[in-house]
Swiss-Prot record:
Family in the record: Belongs to the PurH family.
CDD domains cross-referenced by the UniProt entry: IMPCH
Domain notes for this protein: The IMP cyclohydrolase activity resides in the N-terminal region.
EC numbers: 2.1.2.3, 3.5.4.10
Regions annotated as coiled coil: none
Record's keyword annotation contains Iron: no
A GO biological process held by the record: 'de novo' IMP biosynthetic process
PANTHER family: BIFUNCTIONAL PURINE BIOSYNTHESIS PROTEIN ATIC, BIFUNCTIONAL PURINE BIOSYNTHESIS PROTEIN PURH
The protein's name in its UniProt record: Bifunctional purine biosynthesis protein PurH
SMART domains on file: AICARFT_IMPCHas (SM00798), MGS (SM00851)
Protein origin, superkingdom: Bacteria
Length: 511
């Protein structure tokens, strides 16, 4: 007769699994709550204490940490000296271990949980047994996932529990215990060193996608094991097709932009760049400004609104082809209108939680990972230094603050032309700065509000041509970081052409 050790926090399916093992001629060893559940189901169970000849102690902290357990798990069946050692110490072989771990994650996700309460949910014996079984998978079946109960029983019944099958179970164990330990490290390190010597994070697969950035690329979406409430990963999809890889990247960018604004705001994004951002007294007015900012590029865009969507705004959005609309909520009539388009992805996010979205940014490079803080600085007019003879007006200062807020979300080299309520022109991703200036000006010139526009740059001007081009096309005020060895040339050109030039002192590259 073979032996199975069962000790689970999640009792789902454990009775049926145990019955299947008994049918396969296993005797069952178990602990505490698991033993009680199995016995109440009419199964004959051997207690761990009967195997170890040692009682549970320290409020259950020590149950299975004993040579009688781990010797039976780790002994190699192909080594006579291992089997002789077990016989000498009267230790039985254990052929299957089924363990799932203390619910550490669900504990720390509860409001008001203390660190002491969380620490009590750090499993020690469970991972130890799983790792022992997984190390010796050639002889021991390690089972950590209730989804594997039926496959294991089927493999035992048909004698297909071969090395390949066992190796797959062992892999799942080591992935699971590594993720479990990583989550504990994340929890304990939340207020610790921002860049630890060893960086570990764990993610859970949320979605396997039809394809990645392009149709020939495979892709999946993983969510941080410590959920971020204000995130695309935690957004609730109310309607529409499954999100694509590109949808998720664009929606993430749009959410980050929307979090910048306290007043009603609408952000429209295409290919990770804003194509229109509008502010207003209400969400309909903000939509109108975002749409008017670039009524061509918004087609097929991702829209984020930071206020509930009303019927009037929904009716306007319904006239366009849009990929995604995200908002805190939707009025019933507004949702009914938008849901007429079966493929439109309609989603909600908790905007009250956006201050908690302070994750580090990571970028994968060959052989490593770049990690940095988010560019979360909030600039105001008091941060600006006027370096030109002409002083900006109050409305120009407000517009430049808005422009600085937007430009840090645009791919470098980045130029934005704005009023204090609306983007008018966005030049993104050009290899030379004057190229981005030309694109932004060309786009903005057709706007009725261009006469009130200012220009913002994510980095300094390497020469005076950007100032000259903007001024000759009607821009009266420019904000840029400064810091070029040719700053004076730009200042002189601004004075020559009678416009305001402001240095923010802070660069906002985005690659």
């Amino acid at each position: 007769m073979k032996t199975a050790l069962l000790s689970v926090s999640d009792k789902t399916g454990i009775v049926e699994f145990a019955r299947g093992l008994v049918k396969a001629d296993f005797r069952i060893i178990s602990t505490g709550g698991t033993k009680k559940v199995l016995e109440e189901a009419g199964l004959s169970i051997v207690s761990v204490e009967a195997i170890t000849n040692f009682p549970e102690m320290l409020d259950g902290r020590v149950k299975t940490l004993h040579p009688a357990i781990h010797g039976g798990l780790l002994a190699r069946r192909d080594l006579p000296e291992h089997l002789a050692a077990l016989k000498e110490h009267n230790i039985d072989l254990i052929d299957l271990v089924c363990v799932n771990l203390y619910p550490f994650k669900s504990t720390i996700m509860q409001n008001g949980v203390t660190e002491a309460e969380a620490i009590e949910q750090i499993d020690i014996g469970g991972p130890s047994m799983l790792r022992s079984a997984a190390k010796n998978f050639a002889s021991v079946l390690p089972v950590v996932d209730p989804k594997d109960y039926q496959p294991v029983l089927a493999a035992l019944a048909h004698q297909t529990d071969n090395v390949k099958f066992r190796r797959a179970l062992a892999l799942k164990v080591f992935q699971h215990t590594a993720a479990y330990d990583t989550l504990i490290a994340q929890y304990l390190g939340q207020n610790g060193e921002i860049f630890p010597d060893e960086l570990t994070k764990t993610y859970t697969k949320k979605q396997v996608m039809r394809y990645g950035e392009n149709s020939h690329q495979k892709a999946a979406f993983y969510e941080d094991a410590l959920p971020v409430p204000f995130s695309i990963a935690q957004a609730q999809q109310l309607h529409g097709k499954e999100l694509s890889y590109n949808n998720i990247k664009d929606a993430d960018a749009a959410l980050k932009m929307s979090a910048e604004f306290n007043q009603p705001a609408v952000v429209a994004v295409k290919h990770m760049n804003p194509c229109g951002i509008g502010l207003g007294q209400n969400i309909e007015e903000a939509w109108d400004r975002a749409y008017e900012a670039d009524s061509m590029s918004i087609f097929g865009g991702i829209i984020v609104l930071n206020r509930p969507v009303d019927l009037a705004t929904a009716e306007k959005m319904h006239k366009l082809f849009l990929e995604i609309i995200i908002a805190p909520s939707f009025e019933k009539e507004a949702f009914t209108v938008l849901a007429q388009k079966k493929n439109l992805r309609i989603m909600t996010v908790d905007f009250n939680q956006h201050q908690d979205a302070k994750e580090l940014e990571t970028v994968s490079v060959m052989g490593g990972l770049l990690v940095q803080e988010q560019d979360a600085v909030v600039e105001t007019a008091t941060d600006f230094k006027v370096v030109s003879k002409r002083q900006p007006t109050e409305s120009e200062l407000k517009a430049m603050v808005f422009g600085q807020t937007v430009v840090k979300h645009v791919k470098s080299n980045a130029i934005v032309i704005t009023t204090d309520q609306q983007t008018l022109g966005i030049g993104a991703g050009q290899m030379n700065r004057i190229g981005s200036v030309e694109i932004a000006v060309k786009q903005a010139e057709g706007s009725a509000n261009f006469k009130n526009a200012v220009m913002a740059s994510d980095a300094f001007f390497p020469m005076e041509d950007c100032v000259e081009y903007a001024a000759k096309h009607g821009i009266k005020a420019i904000v840029e970081p400064g810091g070029s060895i040719k700053d004076q040339a730009s200042i002189d050109k601004a004075d020559e052409l009678g416009i305001s030039l402001i240095f923010s002192g802070r660069r906002h590259f985005r690659h």
